[in-house]
Regions:
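Conserved acidic, metal-coordinating active-site core of Asp-based
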Residues: 72, 76-79, 83-194, 198, ...
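Active-site phosphate-binding/coordination module
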Residues: 2-102
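Short, structured coil segments at secondary-structure junctions
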Residues: 33-35, 42-43, 51, 151-152, ...
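A generic "binding-loop/recognition-motif" signal
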Residues: 1, 22, 43, 86, ...
């Protein structure tokens, strides 16, 4: 995939990372792939810079809504990461659980462990950009989603069967990508996007050429004009190479 990104950039095409991950973690991917400096991060709630190692734009959720949402997931006992700018707020229990599979530098350098995230953000008036909630129990996810959706000022979505993501209703990857395009001197009418899950829908809807990964959900495939190979088959590289060929 890094080779395809390099070929695209050499031919004058901008390639940016658009992800649900926080700035530090997204930066790891951007450096590995060799993409442009600007990134859409935190599911569209933030724009970030690889070189500056920080958010350049934030759309945070209302303070009270963020505290209430954190309290809900803490009460149910679900592991959660709360994104506040460049910092990931987690509890000691979250740290143990996420630590089982997260060891990348971006995660380790971003995390801040506090006894209660809900209490911490309420006491310190922390602006929250996103919450990432994970569970292997589908019943718990349904229960949490039902409770979270009753809180005004937030939007609940998912990027996989085992998670929930919470952001402000004003933010999505499509809006953020539009802002990023303007920074690059272009617009969404000249943009393509590649996605596979619910949190990609707004971005795919916003661009001129929406491309579904081969492993994408049915909702994503139905929305897209084109389908590429799966993640396992380097579908992103295949999609980029086809765009290079068409613009050659």
């Amino acid at each position: 995939t890094a080779d395809a990104v390099r070929r695209a950039r050499e031919s004058g095409i901008h390639v940016v990372v658009s992800t649900g991950r926080i700035c530090g973690e997204a930066r790891d991917f951007a450096l590995m792939l060799g993409t442009d400096d600007q990134m859409v991060t935190s599911g569209g709630a933030t724009l970030s810079s690889v070189s500056q190692e920080r958010c350049t734009m934030r759309m945070s959720m209302p303070g009270e809504a963020a505290v209430r949402a954190s309290a809900v997931v803490e009460r149910i006992g679900m592991i959660t990461m709360v994104y506040a700018g460049e910092t990931l707020l987690i509890t000691p229990y979250d740290d143990i659980e996420f630590g089982k599979y997260k060891s990348n530098e971006g995660y380790l350098s971003s995390k801040k462990v506090v006894p209660s995230v809900a209490e911490y953000i309420a006491t310190n008036h922390v602006s929250v950009d996103k919450m990432f909630i994970r569970s292997q129990d589908p019943v718990m996810l349904v229960r949490a989603r039902a409770q979270l959706e009753q809180i005004p000022g937030i939007r609940v979505m998912s990027s996989a069967a085992d998670n929930l993501e919470v952001i402000t209703p004003a933010a999505d990857k499509g809006v953020a990508l539009g802002m990023l395009c303007r920074e690059l001197g272009t617009d969404l009418d000249h943009a393509a996007a590649i996605g596979d899950s619910e949190n990609d829908l707004e971005m795919l809807n916003a661009v001129a050429l929406p491309i579904a990964m081969g492993n994408a959900s049915a909702a994503v495939k139905n929305l897209c004009l084109r389908e590429t190979l799966t993640n396992a088959q380097d579908g992103v590289a295949a999609a980029i190479d086809r765009i290079i060929a068409e613009n050659g």
